[in-house]
A protein has these predicted regions:
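Short hydrophobic alpha-helices and adjacent helix-cap/hinge residues
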Residues: 1-346
Length: 346
């Protein structure tokens, strides 16, 4: 009888253990189902959320950056109106308009701001305090105070750098090769723009190296730019050389038209300006810059922090020459320079 009782006890313990194990399995299964349901709900909510992106550019060729941004977002599967809304502001080269737009965006609590050019990014950074900022700038973002380093931005800003200021000397060298008799070059820039002042210093340095006289004119507004260009006298300069200044570049069509009327060859940093009638450019494609920036917008939309997103550098440079413009101003481009061009507009 003792054996029978002991056997019953053992069987009871075994049954309890099996029951407990079975209960634990059900609990674990339930936890997995709940977790999957929550994750699915979060994913669905994230997909259904429409993100609002404030975009600020300074007009003219900088619109190509915004076009590239839209192209890049589409390539990433993000549709305007379905996944995000872009509120685009064109400041027409005026910093005050950039500041006003940035303040509007922060008041409206957009999810992030995309700023094009160094001066625009500086203005946006200065008048906002919390919104993540994705930039596309032509100068060193570390030296400009936007990020702590390229690898670890460390704040609320990150984005793409395209070399504009760094290529000042190279563009001047190419202009000299295109115009062997070149001796006087006019540059017009805003003396209140730190990036432009640095670019002017580099142009001066390169000018001495190539035996060129730089004629410097200052303009702090679009009206002043028009006045300075209009005041240029015949044969006062042999060519117009564009340096890194967002306000001047934003008025590229004005500059091109006035230069052409004075039969002045022009050298720019952005390719689209050559298709607009400029003589030549050496630098990056703004549309490509915008496409690269789209990756940062997408990553921040899905939870990444700007401080953790490495700044990307665009390092592909192309020489573009417009032979239609050369003919219009009575200029013959040396064959050796034409042979080096990545693209020739005929």
């Amino acid at each position: 009888m003792e054996k029978t009782l002991w056997a019953r006890v053992l069987n009871s313990d075994c049954g309890n253990r099996k029951s407990k194990i079975q209960n634990l399995k059900w609990v674990a299964l339930f936890a997995i189902v709940v977790a999957l349901t929550v994750c699915g709900a979060r994913a669905e909510a994230q997909q259904s959320k429409v993100y609002r992106v404030g975009v600020i550019h300074q007009g003219g060729p900088y619109k190509a950056v915004v076009d590239g941004l839209r192209d890049g977002l589409r390539q990433l599967g993000l549709e305007e109106g379905k996944h995000l809304l872009l509120n685009v502001r064109d400041s027409k080269g005026e910093v005050k308009a950039v500041e006003a737009a940035a303040k509007d965006f922060e008041r409206d609590r957009v999810n992030l701001i995309f700023a094009v050019t160094t001066s625009a990014t500086t203005a946006v950074k200065n008048v906002t305090s919390e919104i993540p900022i994705v930039f596309s700038v032509g100068s060193d973002p570390v030296a400009s105070g936007f990020v702590q380093s390229f690898a670890k931005p460390g704040g609320r800003l990150t984005g793409v750098q395209y070399s504009t200021t760094d290529l000042t000397g190279k563009r001047l060298e190419i202009l000299k090769e295109m115009l062997p008799k070149l001796s006087r070059v006019v540059i017009i820039y805003n003396p209140k723009n730190r990036t432009a002042v640095e670019a002017a210093a580099l142009a001066r340095q390169a000018g001495k190296q190539f035996g060129l006289q730089l004629i410097e004119r200052h303009a702090t507004s679009v009206d002043e730019l028009r006045q300075r260009f209009g005041a240029l006298k015949a044969k006062e300069a042999d060519a117009f050389f564009s340096i890194s200044d967002a306000m001047v570049t934003s008025q590229a069509q004005l500059v091109i038209d006035m230069a052409t009327s004075k039969k002045l060859p022009t050298m720019f940093s952005e390719q689209s300006l050559v298709t607009m009638g400029g003589l030549a450019s050496y630098g990056q494609n703004f549309n490509e810059v915008g496409r690269l920036a789209a990756k940062y917008v997408q990553k921040i939309m899905t939870g990444a922090q700007p401080r953790d997103l490495r700044v990307e550098i665009v390092d592909k440079f192309e020489l573009i020459i417009n032979l239609k413009t050369a003919k219009q101003i009575g200029l013959t481009i040396p064959p050796n320079v034409l042979a080096r061009a990545d693209r020739v507009i005929r």
